[in-house]
Amino acid sequence: MAISKLNDRIQLIDGFDLGLEQRTGSYVIMEQQLTIIETGPSPSVEHVKQGLKELGISLDEVRYIIVTHIHLDHAGGAGLLLQDCPNATLIVHPKGARHLANPSRLIAGARAVYGDKFDDLFNPIVPVPEHRIAIKTEGDRLQIGPDCSLEFWDTPGHAKHHFGILDPVSNGFFVGDTAGIRYAQLIEDGIDFYLPSTSPNQFDPEAMKASIERMESQQLDVLYFGHYGAAMNPQAALRQVLEWLELFVEEGAAAYRHDESADQLAKRLAAPVMAQLAEKGVKQPHRVMPYIEMDLQVSAQGLLDYFRKQS
């Protein structure tokens, strides 16, 4: 079981999303009111439960399960995990709550994208009883310990149903996907590398930029990424994502003007990414490449979707 101790209070459990290590993680905040941030998809729930067991935590002790947004790789397992955590309440953005109570649209949308792979990747998606859902919105707080009151920020850009969570004790921020993706596979090579996540179908570049700049202004000490792990250099990480975001939008606009496919746009995006990795000394083939290729494909789809809606 892959568990990383990030500090005295926060542990990261690898959910092996898509069968990949260091893809999507669940954060465990060891406060008086034990809190989990992100469940991952349903196939990750067994990994989360095993991780809690190894940490000496019983499922009865879990008080809050928070999902930053309702995309299935972050929240698909919420209903399944909640079934085994009898004392837990699920915390979600107001625009996401009804879709977790009645996930039929989430399921239909994912089936349309993933087809025959849906069952292996996401099943089962269990509805969350409405009485076990609590909504948090901009400026709301959640007291989870005598000295810890989590603060919720509305952080659109990746999705409209997205919030981030400020942890005052570590001066850290749980970014979900709004501040992009951290490629943990490159850390062993001494390389900090981040890309934006511009996936469909609610990507909004201006909102994403504003959310990231708000994080920058907070002078944080750590960022906790949904994909994947903790960055101890928040300003540099956020600046990197903003620079790539500008380039992604430029390339997306050009691809849309030329009526290119998502595959063609993904290749456009891959060229500067590969060039920068080569500059940083990354030798190919590298185990990070399947992650990056997958992310660029999804980001290309979101960029084209955005420009179609603007026309």
Give residue ranges: language-model regions.
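Metallo-beta-lactamase
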Residues: K5, P41-P43, E61-D73, L100-P156, K160-Y224, ...
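Active-site/pore-lining binding-face segments in mid-to-C-terminal subdomains
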Residues: E206, S211-R268
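Residue-level marker for buried hydrophobic side chains located in beta-strands
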Residues: T35, I66, L90, G172-F174, ...
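C-terminal regulatory/interaction regions
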Residues: E250-S311
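Conserved beta-strand hairpin/beta-sheet module of binuclear metal-dependent hydrolase folds
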Residues: A2-L55, I165-D177
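Metal-dependent catalytic neighborhoods of phosphoester/phosphodiester hydrolases
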Residues: A75-C85, P103, Q235
